[in-house]
Amino acid sequence: MSNKEIEDNEDVWKERCMNCIRCNDEKNCGTCWPCRNGKTCDMRKCFSAKRLYNEKVKRQTDENLKAIMAKTAQREAAHQAATTTAPSAPVVIEQQVEKKKRGRKKGSGNGGAAAAAQQRKANIINERDYVPNRPTRQQSADLRRKRTQLNAEPDKHPRQCLNPNCIYESRIDSKYCSDECGKELARMRLTEILPNRCKQYFFEGPSGGPRSLEDEIKPKRAKINREVQKLTESEKNMMAFLNKLVEFIKTQLKLQPLGTEERYDDNLYEGCIVCGLPDIPLLKYTKHIELCWARSEKAISFGAPEKNNDMFYCEKYDSRTNSFCKRLKSLCPEHRKLGDEQHLKVCGYPKKWEDGMIETAKTVSELIEMEDPFGEEGCRTKKDACHKHHKWIPSLRGTIELEQACLFQKMYELCHEMHKLNAHAEWTTNALSIMMHKQPNIIDSEQMSLFNKSQSTSSSASAHGATTPISSTSSSSSSSSKNDDEMEDTAEFLANLAVQKEEETQNN
């Protein structure tokens, strides 16, 4: 379906996720084109409707394919039953062949032909009667392949049981001849292979598993801690900058406006970049831009059903959409609360910024880190008449809040990365992970000699308490067709037992 067909299809917009703000909106706007034509309002169309509709269509297609498979299986079963009950050799019955005559038979008309046609249609399985969407060629081929895999015959060559002590063949679709053999082999892994793996992994040396894991994770943790400390300092600097801004505004509250009001030539006009209005006097241009921006922002809903405890979002609850506003607190055109700047009589824009005295601060972060970012003097023009610095305080606070939101996102990513490192460290030292993964690679010759020496001492010490080794006949009989991972562990276990036996004979 094309995009236009999807937009016009009402079945698509009936799907609801009940998690987005549009699903929770219960009223229509009454101004959009779908509302005027009796369709789903644009403000109530779910963001996930297309995805949910595609999943629904796919689910229906799968059900239809299953119905086709069931009908096909019934037809094949009926055909197979008919062929098995039929006689092996056809019996030839001689019948008197009547001579065909021209014309129709008496009593036969269009009714007989119609009945025969209906009988033929009844014998044919019409898939369109119960399948709204016919499968494609690829889907039909996949169905045939799956059906052949399910009906495939088991392996003609029997496999031997994976238990080293067992000489019988395994069951169908199993690796063992019985449940006892599987439990016995699992017990061998836990009692013989796992301790050896643990000794190899927790080897005290430069190549030990915990030592190498610590060397790998320690610099990453240190880097994350440095980043977190840096972000924490940046957050403190931003809060200190906002406190300095409040103190600077308090010093400007007592001042009175000086000088004449700035006026532009009435012949200068400019076009609005928001609404597109061409002729706007330059004297009213900034206020017009602000009103157009506020009007366009109010038309768009920025909300979420959950409330955050952050200090830089509006978080005003809207009962109409059952959501919390997620605009920046200082720039929200609907719920913004004026602070001490509403009592200002002068503009208050710092003269230090206007005179170019802060050439060293080229970015907002550099301005925040300055000890005296505002200076002592500000613009003494009347607040409503100053067109150069229109509402500079909300703009500055909005910039700081945006920086705080970015810091919060970076902090969240760092915490997630630290959680992944901790989970990796816990999983690596787990018994299941040690059983699944191979031993660490040892490349240095000195480390190899130390490792072999420790292995020989540990094997000689554990030789007295070792269990009775498995007979050579059973091990030789079980050495065929052992290619999977479990057989590799079994072979390693048998090799260790052989080494222990040789050491016992040498010691004796």
Curated annotation (Swiss-Prot):
Biased composition (Low complexity): 113-123, 454-481
Keyword Nucleus part of the UniProt annotation: yes
Gene name of the encoded protein: cfp-1
Source domain of life: Eukaryota
Subunit-level organization: Component of the SET2 complex (also known as the SET1/COMPASS complex), which contains at least set-2, swd-2.1, cfp-1, rbbp-5, wdr-5.1, dpy-30 and ash-2. Within the complex, interacts with wdr-5.1, ash-2 and dpy-30. Also interacts with the SIN3S complex, which contains at least sin-3, hda-1, athp-1 and mrg-1. Interacts with sin-3, hda-1 and mrg-1.
Stretches the record annotates as Disordered: 95-156, 453-508
Zinc finger boundaries on the chain: CXXC-type: 10-47
Keywords annotated in UniProt: DNA-binding, Metal-binding, Nucleus, Transcription, Transcription regulation, Zinc, Zinc-finger
MF annotations from Gene Ontology: DNA binding; methylated histone binding; zinc ion binding
Entry's Gene Ontology BP terms: positive regulation of DNA-templated transcription; transdifferentiation
Protein name in UniProt: CXXC-type zinc finger protein 1
Function: Transcriptional activator that exhibits a unique DNA binding specificity for CpG motifs; enriched at promoters containing the trimethylation mark on histone H3 'Lys-4' (H3K4me3). Forms part of the SET2 complex and interacts with the SIN3S HDAC complex at promoters. Required for H3K4 trimethylation and plays a repressive role in the expression of heat shock and salt-inducible genes. Required for fertility, in cooperation with class I histone deacetylases (HDACs).
GO CC terms in record: Set1C/COMPASS complex
Localization in the cell: Nucleus
InterPro entries associated with the record: CpG-bd_C, Spp1/CFP1
Primary location recorded for the protein, binned into one broad class: nucleus
Keyword Iron: no
